[in-house]
């Protein structure tokens, strides 16, 4: 397995170009199964999960090409099963189910794998598809969905806010007969992006970005061209990189209005932040950040995917900060690793109490999930001495060329190839 060797401390400064959002590109790629004509998707990041998705779509009979953009032609889909060998590495595969059953009347997806954070059941996806009239069976490790004729529009009230299930129901409902209303829908920018992509293909969706999404079913979706929105979590990660190192950064191809909660906390930490239509700049003027209190919650509140990075910020900040995780249990696996680097923190229930220290020291640490690994790499950039981050395949699932981008900011980082 590859690892990163990071030599610190470094002040990170310079420019970085933000990639397309993985969490929008994935549902959009799966939603392209609904289209009867070719689709061009621009600004798709080069990531392991994207490669897996393109392989999966190819296995279903979709024609997939990548040359700058990703081109998808799902006019000749002839296989309706997503097998375990591809699904096991990636939970997002469940998003194939809604489009398959909506367009072809059948689909089956192996129960998924992915990051090891807490309970992420597929129950809400199944609940939504059953409400739309699909017959669902769990057999031999597969979720199997079928329907006679078309799915039927329904009024669906979600028990809890779920990004994944909102995507499944919304994409399946585009081809259902009649109107579907999703109450307590997720409001994330990536949901809005997926809805806007479907609208570009001819779907009738309103209310995306609110907790009530309305979908009027249409008979077919055509082709189109769509550009994936910038990755707000990658943007936030690089802003934190500059903030913890007293540095200065300009993020290009960013979308500031998707990051309000994160930018507010960075300002509280003492960062000087400016924004334009597609850029964000942050300047710490060489200062240490101040500790901040953070509570994760569904969008538009503070995103759980930025929690690990802000835990690190608090560990090197002036003062004591509290970070409360309300979305996933078991999402503090980075904390013991950061403590090994000299961080001072204790975990009480779903809150980590961080006591800022002036410096961290390099150590051998292990990545446990995607965002935790990013925080360990950033910690290595500012720690005294050498840090080795193991199991970085997690990072490759969600950050495009992270070492190249960090190197451009002055980090001393290299990838050590595994056996």
From Swiss-Prot:
Its main location: cytoplasm. The modification 2-(S-cysteinyl)pyruvic acid O-phosphothioketal is found at residue 115. Phosphoenolpyruvate binds at residues 22-23. One of its GO terms (biological process) is UDP-N-acetylgalactosamine biosynthetic process. UDP-N-acetyl-alpha-D-glucosamine binds at residues 91, 120-124, 160-163, 305, 327. Keywords: Cell cycle, Cell division, Cell shape, Cell wall biogenesis/degradation, Cytoplasm, Peptidoglycan synthesis, Pyruvate, Transferase. It is an enzyme of class 2 (transferase). SUPFAM superfamilies: EPT/RTPC-like. GO terms for molecular function: UDP-N-acetylglucosamine 1-carboxyvinyltransferase activity. It comes from the Bacteria. The keyword ATP-binding does not apply. Belongs to the EPSP synthase family. MurA subfamily. This is UDP-N-acetylglucosamine 1-carboxyvinyltransferase. It comes from Enterobacter sp. (strain 638).
């Amino acid at each position: 397995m590859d690892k990163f060797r990071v030599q610190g401390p470094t002040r990170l400064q310079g420019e970085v170009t933000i990639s397309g959002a993985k969490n929008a590109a994935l549902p959009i790629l799966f939603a392209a199964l609904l289209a009867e004509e070719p689709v061009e998707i621009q600004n798709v990041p080069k990531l392991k999960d994207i490669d897996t998705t393109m392989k999966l779509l190819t296995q279903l009979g979709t024609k997939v090409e990548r040359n700058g953009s990703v081109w998808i032609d799902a006019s000749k889909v002839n296989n309706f099963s997503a097998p375990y060998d591809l699904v096991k590495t990636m939970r997002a595969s469940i998003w194939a189910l809604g489009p398959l059953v909506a367009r072809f009347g059948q689909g089956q997806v192996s129960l998924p794998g992915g990051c090891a954070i807490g309970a992420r059941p597929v129950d809400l996806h199944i609940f939504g598809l059953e409400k739309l009239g699909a017959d669902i069976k769990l057999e031999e490790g597969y979720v199997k969905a079928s329907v006679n004729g078309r799915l039927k529009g329904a009024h669906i009230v979600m028990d809890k806010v779920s990004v994944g299930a909102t995507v499944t129901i919304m994409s399946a409902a585009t081809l259902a007969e009649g109107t579907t209303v999703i109450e307590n829908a997720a409001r994330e920018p990536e949901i809005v992006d997926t809805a806007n992509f479907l609208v570009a293909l001819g779907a009738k969706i309103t209310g995306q970005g609110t907790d009530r999404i309305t979908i009027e079913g249409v008979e077919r979706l055509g082709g189109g061209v769509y550009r994936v929105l910038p990755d707000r979590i990658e943007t936030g990660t690089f802003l934190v990189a500059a903030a913890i190192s007293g540095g200065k950064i300009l993020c290009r191809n960013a979308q500031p209005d998707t990051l309000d909660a994160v930018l507010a906390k960075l300002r509280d930490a003492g960062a000087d932040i400016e924004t334009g239509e597609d850029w964000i700049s942050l300047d710490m003027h060489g200062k240490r950040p101040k500790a901040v209190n953070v509570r994760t919650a569904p969008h538009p509140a503070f995103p759980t995917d930025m929690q690990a990075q802000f835990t690190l910020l608090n560990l090197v900040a002036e003062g004591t900060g509290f970070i409360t995780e309300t979305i996933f249990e078991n999402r503090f696996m980075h904390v013991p690793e950061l403590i090994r680097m000299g961080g001072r923190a204790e975990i009480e229930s779903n809150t980590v109490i961080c006591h800022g220290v002036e410096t961290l020291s390099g150590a051998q640490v292990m990545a446990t999930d995607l965002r935790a690994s990013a925080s360990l790499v950033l910690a290595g950039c500012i720690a005294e001495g050498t840090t080795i981050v193991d199991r970085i395949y997690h990072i490759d699932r969600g950050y495009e060329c992270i070492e190249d981008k960090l190197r451009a900011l002055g980090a001393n980082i290299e990838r050590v190839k595994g056996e």
